[in-house]
Amino acid sequence: MAGARAAAAASAGSTASSGSPPPQEPGLWELLEEFSRTQYRAKDSGGKSGSKVERIEKRCLELFGRDYCFSVIPNVNGDICGHYPRHIVFLEYESSEKEKDTFQSTVQVNKLQDLIHRSKMARCRGRFVCPVILFKGKHICRSATLAGWGELYGRSGYNYLFSGGADDTWASTEDVTEEDFVLRSGDTHLFDKVRGYDIKLLQYLSVKYICDLMVENKKVKFGMNVTSSEKVDKAQRYANFTLLSIPYPGCEFFKEYKDRDYMAEGLIFNWKQDYVDAPLNIPNFLTQSLNIDWSQYQSWDLVQQTQNYLKLLLFIMNRDDDSGLLVHCISGWDRTPLFISLLRLSLWADGLIHTSLKPAEILYLTVAYDWFLFGHMLVDRLSKGEEIFFFCFNFLKHITSEEFCLKTQRRKSLPTRDAGFTVEDICMLRHKDRGSTTSLGSDFSLVLEHSPGAVGSFSYETVELAPAGAPTQAAWRKSHSSSPQSMLWSRPQPSEERLPSHHGLTEAKSSSSSSSNHSDNFFRMGSSPLEVPKPRSVDHPLPGSSLSTDFGSWQLVSGCGSIQDRPVLHTDSSLPFSFQDELPNSCLLTALSDRETRLQEVRSAFLAAYSSTVGLRAATPSPSGAIGGLLEQFARGVGLRGTSTSTL
């Protein structure tokens, strides 16, 4: 545990070592202070707090307007929903001329508003299906789960159903079955009516996939079923949708995350609890292309579970159809914003949405819109230690790898094989694969391709190495462009895989590829240091390298390290590579990618702002003080704070 805490502290301090604070969004600290002080309510628009909320709302509209043409659905005073934004943004199309011609919404806002008003009572707390992300013309939506009879009738009568959901208290109701109550009410068509409008809204938004994060089939409160879900609708009203039951722990579980000094690795949910009755259920056509053993989901820790669910959601959105996606939990303000935020940030990091926003700006938009304005109760969660909000942005370090990337790679003559590698991977070839820049008698193909934003790549355009048996030649063509590039290598799969066992090496598990599928494509163990050119000395290693040593005019970088400077190769020189006899059939070693850089900047900006406003609450005093001083160390290192004034 102490080692894990030290690693976390080192991660936070890596940016601090650069001596410059991460870029900050004006107003982010004010947003976090307001967020940690009170829960947002659409009807509370007066006074000092109201002016702050107005600034937050205005800033969100500005940030959406950078890249999208959108309409605003008014929710003044919470007329539609008391804990949805007062200005609900409906994204119509990207404002760039290219994207405008490619994807354009066919939704009429007036009709959408009408369906929203009619369908709002169908879902828990009036939290209707709301589109929040536009990707390739498809809407990613959020909502609460379906309201059960207990909510429909058990609050303050029918008046509540049309009041905008201002009253969140639960009323006592006789514990009878849903069927009995419907018969007693004399309105046997009530569920057909309200859920029928909900279905019409989903269809109007072209939503086909519904992802249910609940660990229960129905939420039981005060001895009665207060909510339901699409997967247990007795009338099978949602049979035409693709329903996915992907149970994920509720906010209560994140108290254990906090009590473990904010370490998610090794934290496994107890699936044997009495109230947990919703098994994982995903259609086969969605799982066949993902190298994940879904039958083992109950053995995944929090990191693996979150990673695999995010991969599934990204895969669904990247399918070649026009179908949208709905993500929901029970109330839709804890687990739902977690995955909506991760989807938004992951797609942004790939340059696929919000393309003009900087890291600090996308962070502000995500915190403000996905969490604050959609009613996450941060004050209550902090008081209980249920820090799912902090987990979300701290988790970005686990999704930096290319396995989460949806950006299409532009390849030049790459054989159809599984693994992709950078130039460093040549160093990992077996002895029989050794060669030079002019003659390589090996059994692999190598292609250099553009990888926008990659750090430390060669400024050469093409390298092609032919398979064994053919005349082999590698030509380096110097490029006038400064755009970064990467190198991909694939070779036949051997019948057996063995990880190398080298004396004196330490195990290094990549936090961004700790998925439970144990894919062969991803590096997991430390390997012998490999040589890469070092044109000049480097004072500070890049974050992510586990071993870095200077050796003459070369720099030794471990298998999971990154090239720290742009190396220079000459056309008349041999590649200064060393090889190993026994290595895994495939592994992934990358320079710091554009995706990783962007997500790291978002996470760093969040930690800096969070440390100065909210701060971490240590569960128990730690002798090492590692977690207690995690954010404090970060803030001091980047010059954000002189002396501590709050308890972290």
UniProtKB/Swiss-Prot annotation:
Enzyme's top EC category: hydrolase
Glycosylated residue positions: 225, 240, 517
Region (Disordered): 1-27, 471-544
Active-site residues (renumbered): 329
Record has Signal as a keyword: no
Biased composition (Low complexity): 1-19
E.C. number(s) listed in UniProt: 3.1.3.95
Tagged with keyword rRNA processing: no
Substrates-to-products reaction catalysed: a 1,2-diacyl-sn-glycero-3-phospho-(1D-myo-inositol-3,5-bisphosphate) + H2O = a 1,2-diacyl-sn-glycero-3-phospho-(1D-myo-inositol-5-phosphate) + phosphate; a 1,2-diacyl-sn-glycero-3-phospho-(1D-myo-inositol-3-phosphate) + H2O = a 1,2-diacyl-sn-glycero-3-phospho-(1D-myo-inositol) + phosphate
Record protein name field: Phosphatidylinositol-3,5-bisphosphate 3-phosphatase MTMR14
Organism: Mus musculus
Lineage: Eukaryota, Metazoa, Chordata, Craniata, Vertebrata
Gene of this entry: Mtmr14
